[in-house]
Amino acid sequence: MAKAKGNREKIKLVSTAKTGHFYTTEKNKRNMPEKMEIKKFDPVIRQHVIYKEAKIK
C-alpha cells in the first residue's frame, strides 16, 4: 500500500535586501495558506532582514 502524499511544500525564502541570498524550508499549505515573511540573518550584508517566500523552480 502506497503512503499518502503529505501537505508540506518546499519553498524558498529570498532576502529583501537584493543580495541574492536565500534559505530553503518547508511549510504546511493547509495550516498557512498565505505567503510567509520572516526576519532572518543575511550573511552577505551581515544584518537581519525580512525574507519573503518564493517558489522553487
UniProtKB/Swiss-Prot annotation:
PROSITE patterns: RIBOSOMAL_L33. One of its GO terms (biological process) is translation. The keyword Ribosomal protein applies. It comes from the Bacteria. GO terms for cellular component: cytosolic large ribosomal subunit. Keywords: Ribonucleoprotein, Ribosomal protein. GO terms for molecular function: structural constituent of ribosome. Coiled coil: none annotated. It holds the Pfam family Ribosomal_L33. Belongs to the bacterial ribosomal protein bL33 family. This is Large ribosomal subunit protein bL33. The lineage of its organism: Bacteria, Pseudomonadati, Pseudomonadota, Gammaproteobacteria, Alteromonadales. The gene is rpmG.
